[in-house]
From Swiss-Prot:
Residues 1-10 have a biased composition (Polar residues). Residues 78-141 form the S5 DRBM domain. The gene is rpsE. InterPro entries: Ribosomal_Su5_D2-typ_SF (IPR020568), Ribosomal_uS5 (IPR000851), Ribosomal_uS5_bac-type (IPR005712), Ribosomal_uS5_C (IPR005324), Ribosomal_uS5_N (IPR013810), Ribosomal_uS5_N_CS (IPR018192), Ribsml_uS5_D2-typ_fold_subgr (IPR014721). It comes from Malacoplasma penetrans (strain HF-2). GO terms for cellular component: small ribosomal subunit. This is Small ribosomal subunit protein uS5. GO terms for molecular function: rRNA binding; structural constituent of ribosome.
Amino acid sequence: MEDIKTTTPEVKNEENKTSEVKEGKALEKNNKPHFVKANSSNVKPFERRSNPNNKKPFSKDGSGNKPNKIVKQSVTGLEEKIVGVKKISKTTKGGRNMRFSALAVIGDRKGNVGFGLGKSIEVPVAIRKALKSAKNNMYKVKMNKNFTLYHEVIGKHGAGKVLIKPAPKGTGVIAGGPIKVVLELCGFKDVYSKNLGKNTSLNMVRATIKGLQMQKSPKEYATLRDKTLKDIWE
């Protein structure tokens, strides 16, 4: 008598499950991503589609620098002056931590000026930090042929407010404190100025530089009004 094999429905279900699992594993193997080793032939340099010229989108010219700022390496022959050094303290759980704060202004007397603030436990280190910060914060200031301003300006920063006026030849720099330091290092020779705000040295320096940057030459006024220089002077 031949043996007759009988299969129950439970055995059939188990066989179907095992076959489905095997098929699923096979599909997973086929669907796995294939990684290609990087070679010099198949690697391409990264390119931005939105910016094909690789220009930084921080300024109009694409240089990445803020307007009226100068690259550190392009300025030579800088003069340095320390506006002031004061003692500051910070209260913590362990007590008061005493430090020194130094404010420095640098310029080449050709329309380039910068300022910086440095803090440290020692005065020489604070001055060194202030000078380094000033070299990284250089600004371009406009000046006419007579080494004075094109027109009157008022610079504001915080509680600081500074009035600066052009003066006739031979007048000199009529100013005091940090304002005079900034004007002299910029290269101005005949200027009137007056402090209309608080006497904080840092705010006075910032207000002076902001006021000087507000100047506009006659050519700029002519282009803004769509006129020639003759029409403006008439």
